[in-house]
């Protein structure tokens, strides 16, 4: 990597090589949107000519021989070993190793345990199990990885941490480079703001390895000297706020989330080093159509919808955890689940789909209440909830309780087993995707739906207010409806309107148009949705924004290098 010389130190000239630190990476280990988002970052940067290394805890993936072969994993000749000193004064030994591989041109480094104690944490297959310890040991791993890349002339142009789990590791890596007088910029992305706090001991040289020493912090228009511990104590040990303060640039996934959530919590004065980098999707309508034709012999949305609703007896989706399975099983007869975990069919009608985690944030409890009211006006409406179980059994029980009185209209699929092609087919066939989130930094499910031409009905919160264009605000460019947050009535009205427009413009049935609050061609709305995704939410557009953010961070690092001089 070309380095620019400053008095007594070096800093990158531009961005040629990026380190992406993350706990999730699609194709390695991923639970939700973070893994897909970081993979889009990495592969998009690669398309722009940036060499990318993704660094993640192993989560035990190196034990899977098939996976190891598929990414050509091989052990690296580097070990991080030492002792952490606990608050109890005892020493806790760690021994960390590394596996190196490649996935679609992106270099992977998996951080693993080399003894049973270390492996019990870094290699735990549950991504977020023992989370504070995984995050701490990932930071300790930098003590060996940084000298290794220095010796092999592989110094990154930027270190990019994604969410708080990798923040201390990224800051520690930057500190280790600066010990060698190389000012590598640190970029921090907040995908979802978390209020995680620890005492200084957690981050310190005793535990996670961060040495307390002077550091330059950007204060509105100049860098000022502080120390890592002083910054930590200033923010009360809040890891997200600490990472933002330490960063050369930080990003969030939407302007609304940055303005309404992030800056009010970290400080408006930090806006000068902020960036907005949208997530992206690789969903395409062509892929949905090909699968629909191959699997169901239908590419027309209405025809596919009919076949999918009739095909439900062939869909077997067994929940992965006992609590979810038990909740559904006990009510199976009233919610259309058969004894073999297949589903009773549904009759044809306007279809609304929900996808995402079954958690309070995502608002499925609000949706099921709104849908009950929809049926008063559109009796043949259908709702399919395709949810990822979260362990919130009270919320799931509430869904089941309400769905039990709508046996002929609602199906709940609570399993991770539904393949991407089938998920895409359900969304493609839908009248609309409904996203009733109480808060949403970005809303990738909405973008995925629009990518296959499915309009979105959402609460007008945070990122959803940017991804979805309300038809009432712009009939020419609208992609769906944004309604008042947590309003069951407005959500119902939007769903009834979508059903009316879909029937009128896709089936020639205008019998419901008296209930619609706008009159627009639903086919045109579908086209608008696809155009919007192609212009704003594709991998290349995301990578260009991210690269601009990296270059802002490079300038900041150069300013710090000048301050050092």
What are the functions of these language-model segments?
Residues 1-565:
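Catalytic cores of nucleotide-sugar-dependent glycosyltransferases that transfer UDP/GDP/TDP-activated
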């Amino acid at each position: 990597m070309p380095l620019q010389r400053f008095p007594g130190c070096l800093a990158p000239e531009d961005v040629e090589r990026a380190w992406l630190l993350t706990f999730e990476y699609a194709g390695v280990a991923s639970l939700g949107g973070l893994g897909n988002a970081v993979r889009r970052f990495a592969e998009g940067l690669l398309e722009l000519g940036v060499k990318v290394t993704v660094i993640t805890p192993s989560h035990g993936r190196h034990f899977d021989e098939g996976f190891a072969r598929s990414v050509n994993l091989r052990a690296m000749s580097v070990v991080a070993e030492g002792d952490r000193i606990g608050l109890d004064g005892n020493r806790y030994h760690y021994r960390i190793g590394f596996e190196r591989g490649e996935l679609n041109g992106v270099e992977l480094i998996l951080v693993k345990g080399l003894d049973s104690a270390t492996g019990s944490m870094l290699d735990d297959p549950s991504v977020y199990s023992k989370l504070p310890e995984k995050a701490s040991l990932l930071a300790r791993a930098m003590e060996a990885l940084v000298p290794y890349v220095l010796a092999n002339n592989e110094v990154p142009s930027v270190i990019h941490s994604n969410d708080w789990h990798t923040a201390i590791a990224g800051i520690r890596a930057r500190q280790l480079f600066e010990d060698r007088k190389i000012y590598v910029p640190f970029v921090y992305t907040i995908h979802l703001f978390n209020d995680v706090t620890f005492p200084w001991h957690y981050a310190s040289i005793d535990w996670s390895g961060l040495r307390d020493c002077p550091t330059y912090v950007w204060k509105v228009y100049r860098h000022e000297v502080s120390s890592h511990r002083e910054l930590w104590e200033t923010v009360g040990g809040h890891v997200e706020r600490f990472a933002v303060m330490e960063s050369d640039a930080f990003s969030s996934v939407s302007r609304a989330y940055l303005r309404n959530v992030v800056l009010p919590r970290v400080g408006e004065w930090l806006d000068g080093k902020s960036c907005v980098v949208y997530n992206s999707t690789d969903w395409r309508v062509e892929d949905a159509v090909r699968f629909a034709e191959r699997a169901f012999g239908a590419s027309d949305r209405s025809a596919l919808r009919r076949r999918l609703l009739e095909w439900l007896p062939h869909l077997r989706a067994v929940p992965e955890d006992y609590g979810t399975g038990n909740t559904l099983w006990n009510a199976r007869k009233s919610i259309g689940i058969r004894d073999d975990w297949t589903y009773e069919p549904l009759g044809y009608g306007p279809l609304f789909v929900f996808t995402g985690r079954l958690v309070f944030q995502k608002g499925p409890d609000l949706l099921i209440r709104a849908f009950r009211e929809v049926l008063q006006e559109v009796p043949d409406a259908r709702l399919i909830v395709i949810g990822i179980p979260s362990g919130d059994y009270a919320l799931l029980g509430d869904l089941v309780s309400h769905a039990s009185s709508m046996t002929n209209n609602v199906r709940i699929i609570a399993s991770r087993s539904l393949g991407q092609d089938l998920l895409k087919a359900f969304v493609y066939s839908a009248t609309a995707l409904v996203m009733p989130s109480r808060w949403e930094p970005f809303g990738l499910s909405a973008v995925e739906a629009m990518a296959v031409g499915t309009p979105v009905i959402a609460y007008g919160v945070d990122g959803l207010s940017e991804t979805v264009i309300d038809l009432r605000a712009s009939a020419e460019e609208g992609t769906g409806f944004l309604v008042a947050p947590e309003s069951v009535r407005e959500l119902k009205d939007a769903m009834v309107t979508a059903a009316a427009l879909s029937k009128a413009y896709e089936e020639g049935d205008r019998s419901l148009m008296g209930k619609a609050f706008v009159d627009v061609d639903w086919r045109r709305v579908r086209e608008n949705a696809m155009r919007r995704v192609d212009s704003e939410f594709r991998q290349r557009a995301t990578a260009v924004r991210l690269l601009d953010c990296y270059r802002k961070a490079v300038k900041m690092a150069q300013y710090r290098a000048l301050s050092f001089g």
